């Protein structure tokens, strides 16, 4: 394994430029106007996997966007690692808050990334982290050091709920057979503090619609006599939390497992500066459920947040109307044991029950998924830990993430495999936000670390 670091250093400029070219393609799965760009990105991933050394690569059609599948099988008797990632990205809105165009990547130095960071939509989530695996395979094949079989499954719908992935997995279980699944779509505690994500929150995503009169009304002629859907919607949403920021939906917490005092004590040992956290977000104080720390609120507790709210007139100037309708999109992050479909139904039942008689309410469920916890005593976790130790010089800290990757629980159910989450991004990388970026050092460190996972997983498996 002596050649790994030297290979990365020798080819780092090309590795960076290849990622930059990939980031130029606006593969926004949520907006059908970018359909051709999403498909173009799948084609680019296919070529990259072929160039990296895969023996077979194919673009697999699904009911939605295609999945790119590739494999490098060196010996069927050796362990097989299945790498999952996604090539679609979040919409870049609001564009006016970006310091540079989101699909014109630039590399700039920052306080956290003095070596430079690539600023572009998808740089960290997940094109940059996914592409680390492509380059790691290239490294291992070009230096003849690959110790195991590697398969790739790269999808184009993660940012819209992976709606076609379950369909694909159920129909391709033999093709996707593996001994462990490896994903880099999470983060580290800090640049110099490697960590392995051992838990993910689940997700329930809904849209609500409140309807009052059959048309927009003149606020002078009708104001005070007719229900205003926007006023009512905001009151209904406000009632979903009590004075302690506890969610008020009946039954919402029934299956939430409280962590033991020992587990909470271990979480508290993770390096975390509340002052730096507030400074990075330009906020004066943190906010959340009473009785829990910021790290706990971010990871082991369920949440309910409004992601968007609209209705009435929002254009320039004034228009005195009472809107006929008001809308909101709401996400609920769930913890293991909470079933997302059950929570969605509880939300729907409660939201409809609190609506005043003067309006009608419609709740439309969108996508969702279950939470996930992986044990730290399996060989996949042990291999990842040893890999980080070799490249970072320190043992990684296990941590639970507040984010969701709903397909992880699907993989365990359908493919009977554990998933290892080796992320290299940072909280400050602004995923889903304007000025998303990914540190050049982190990107190259990921390419350097992944081969060691292959090495140790193979050694621990045979």
Regions inferred by a protein language model and the residue ranges of each:
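Active-site metal-coordination/substrate-binding segment of hydrolases
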Residues: 78-151, 445
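Polar, glycine-rich mid-to-C-terminal structural blocks
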Residues: 213-216, 220-277
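Acidic, glycine-rich active-site loops and adjacent beta-strand->loop/helix elements
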Residues: 87-89, 153-162, 184-189, 212-214, ...
């Amino acid at each position: 394994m002596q050649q790994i670091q030297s290979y990365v250093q020798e080819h780092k400029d090309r590795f960076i430029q290849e990622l930059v070219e990939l980031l130029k393609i606006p593969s926004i799965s949520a907006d059908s106007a970018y359909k051709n760009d999403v498909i173009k990105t799948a084609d680019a991933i296919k070529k990259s996997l072929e160039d990296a050394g895969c023996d077979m690569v194919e673009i697999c059609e699904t009911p939605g966007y295609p999945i790119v599948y590739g494999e490098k099988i060196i010996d069927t008797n050796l362990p097989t690692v299945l790498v999952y990632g996604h090539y679609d990205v979040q919409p870049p809105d609001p564009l006016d808050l970006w310091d540079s165009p989101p699909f014109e990547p630039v590399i700039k130095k920052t306080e956290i990334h003095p070596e430079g960071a690539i600023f572009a939509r998808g740089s960290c989530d997940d094109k940059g982290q996914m592409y680390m695996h492509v380059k790691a395979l290239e490294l291992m094949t070009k230096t003849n050091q690959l110790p195991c079989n590697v398969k790739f499954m790269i999808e184009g719908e993660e940012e819209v709920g992976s709606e076609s992935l379950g369909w694909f997995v159920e129909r391709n279980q033999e093709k996707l057979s593996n001994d462990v699944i490896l994903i880099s779509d999470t983060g580290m505690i800090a640049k110099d503090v490697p960590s392995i994500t051992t838990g993910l929150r689940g997700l329930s995503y809904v849209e609500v619609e409140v309807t009052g009169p059959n048309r927009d009304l003149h606020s002078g002629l009708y104001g005070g006599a007719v229900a205003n859907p926007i006023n009512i919607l905001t009151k209904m949403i406000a009632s979903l939390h009590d004075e302690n920021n506890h969610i008020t939906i009946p039954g919402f917490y029934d299956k939430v497992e409280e962590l033991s005092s020992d587990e909470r004590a271990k979480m508290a040992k993770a390096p975390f500066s509340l002052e730096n956290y507030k400074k990075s977000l330009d906020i004066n104080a943190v906010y959340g459920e009473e009785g829990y720390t910021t790290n706990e609120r971010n990871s082991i507790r369920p949440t309910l947040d409004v992601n968007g709210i609209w209705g009435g007139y929002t254009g320039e100037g004034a228009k005195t109307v009472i809107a006929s309708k008001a809308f909101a999109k709401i996400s609920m992050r769930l913890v293991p044991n909470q079933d997302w479909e059950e929570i969605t139904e509880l939300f729907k039942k409660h939201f409809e029950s609190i609506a005043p008689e003067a309006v009608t309410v419609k709740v439309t469920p969108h996508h969702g998924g279950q939470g996930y916890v992986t044990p730290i005593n399996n060989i996949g976790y042990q291999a990842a830990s040893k890999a980080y130790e070799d490249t970072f010089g320190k043992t990684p800290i296990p941590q639970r993430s507040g984010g969701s990757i709903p397909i992880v629980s699907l993989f365990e159910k359908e493919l009977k495999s554990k998933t290892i989450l080796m992320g290299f991004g940072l909280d400050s990388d602004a995923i889903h936000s304007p000025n998303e970026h990914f540190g050049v050092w982190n990107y190259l460190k990921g390419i350097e670390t992944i081969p060691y996972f292959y090495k140790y997983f193979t050694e621990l498996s045979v």
